[in-house]
């Protein structure tokens, strides 16, 4: 997995020690590409679903890039999870350019197999697809990797969703004291971890 690090300085912010980083893109690129990411099906025990919704993570990554406009699941006319279930007429009617479907299957204790397929809706053909073994711990990272593959396949540029970011938080403690922390997190702000805690300014990772 890629491990590129970026610095985000939270200047003047007062964050709780356990607060999560929220990354919000308020304006996407003009002409963002319409895409549908169908919620991934779970092929295992309904009472023991995977810890993360892979399709939701993929859609959120693509939306956050500003290059794509994912269709809301509520607007979908169907929710195929296998190639033979795809009726491209449904997606053409919704003016969707590309379609992502997939499923998750159990693979031994704590393991999963994630399969996904990317389609060109107007050509009515599969562009790419992968079967990816993973674990419960790495399932969200696998979803980011899927988003990277989709992004690069459709734009020709490498995705950065599976990278990590580094950022600094500042929390005031008392009148003249300040607690400063260097943290790392997933590119979407998930799973933050404190690397350094100090009462002195931290300007870089």
Over which residues does each language-model region extend?
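Amphipathic beta-strand/beta-sheet edge segments enriched in Tyr/Trp
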Residues: 21, 82-149
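Multi-bladed beta-propeller domains
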Residues: 186-203
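Conserved beta-propeller blade repeats
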Residues: 138-139, 153-156, 199-205
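Short beta-strand->alpha-helix linker/helix-N-cap micro-motif
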Residues: 24-89, 100, 104-106
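Sec-dependent N-terminal signal peptides
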Residues: 4-13
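Structural motif
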Residues: 109-113, 174-183
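Sec/Tat signal peptide C-region and signal peptidase I cleavage site
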Residues: 15-19
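Residue position within the beta-strands of beta-propeller blades
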Residues: 101, 165-170
